Design a protein with these regions (language model features):
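C-terminal active-site subregion of NodB/CE4 polysaccharide deacetylases
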Residues: 1-87, 93-94, 177, 194-289
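Active-site flanking residues adjacent to catalytic metal/cofactor-binding acidic residues
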Residues: 88-89, 184
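Short, glycine/acidic-enriched loop or turn micro-motifs at the edges of active sites
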Residues: 92-93, 188
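Membrane-embedded segments
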Residues: 95-99
Length: 289
């Protein structure tokens, strides 16, 4: 019954949005600020991604690659209304088998933000322990070696050895696909607002090196894990020549690519996810200062 109610509410939000003219008014507003719809997820079930992309494509949205997004940002190509940008965090296992065929069918490019150490370990540290200990939220402030020591201890005690993330080989194959781009997500999925600037910079540089070695291409974007950073960190990342991808709407006017964290849910139905997308209308601002 709950599922039916959620589906009905989601359908109502989506339908009323389209029929009420809100869609036209919001798209007109996009024409004034050059915004791009940001569709963002982690590890969606294939049917979830398929239904959401299909809904958007059928309503006239055209998904652009990171190269195209940066061309618009830099004024090398004109912005077009109903433009969208699809991104995924972390690079979860099964992407190649489960999600790539959907991208190919709709010809939708996607950007995956990768933390190489987490790829090597096979897990995102928060996801692997949050159900096993109530102490995990205190570990954001710890340096990587101490944090991993605590994570490994909890996993060993709970026999938590299942791989969650795609391995290096899968990511390398994905990076060679014309629809897929890999970008920087720090080296250890670091909380950039909890650790010193120098540590964040070191992780950014190490990720640049590793991903260039894996893929033959040096990343241009860096997405902050957990969506947080400090002003000092943000400035330091820019000085490296990287373009920050931020979760803070306020940063959209600071020369970064502001990627709102009102993401679609990995396991929700179509109309629930359409409701999430339309309520917040996440966007990236491509008119940079």
């Amino acid at each position: 019954m709950r599922k039916l109610i959620r589906k009905a509410v989601g359908w109502g939000v989506a339908t009323s949005y389209v029929l009420s003219g809100c869609r036209r008014r919001q798209l007109a507003a996009y024409g004034m600020n050059g915004a791009v719809l940001s569709v963002f997820g982690h590890n969606p079930r294939p049917i979830v991604l398929d239904s959401l992309l299909g809904w958007l494509v059928r309503r006239g949205f055209r998904f652009i690659s990171t190269d195209e997004l940066l061309s618009v940002r830099d004024g090398k190509r004109a912005w077009e209304p109903q433009t969208a940008w699809l991104t995924f965090d972390d690079g979860w296992a099964g992407f190649e088998r489960g999600l790539l065929p959907i991208l190919e069918r709709y010809q939708v490019p996607a950007t995956i933000f990768v933390a190489p150490m987490e790829t090597e370990r096979g897990k995102i540290w928060t996801n692997s322990v949050m159900g096993l200990t109530c102490e995990w939220h205190k570990w954001y402030d710890l340096p990587a070696d101490e944090r991993y020591s605590k994570v490994d201890k909890v996993l060993a005690e709970n026999a938590g050895k299942v791989r969650q993330l795609a391995d290096k080989d899968e990511l390398c194959r994905l990076s060679q696909h014309p629809l897929v781009t890999l970008e920087n997500h720090t080296y250890t999925h670091l909380s950039c607002s909890h650790r010193p600037v120098d540590e964040v910079v070191d992780e950014a540089l190490e990720t640049q090196r590793v991903l260039a070695e894996w893929t033959g291409r040096t990343p241009r974007l860096m997405c902050y894990p957990f969506g947080h950073c400090t002003d000092e960190t943000d400035n330091a990342i820019r000085e490296l020549g990287l373009i920050p991808v931020s979760s803070f709407p306020g940063r959209m006017t600071w020369g970064s690519i502001g990627k709102c964290r009102n993401m679609f849910h990995d396991a929700m139905g179509l109309y629930e996810n359409v409701g999430r997308v339309l309520q917040a209308w996440p966007r990236v601002n491509v008119h940079m200062a």
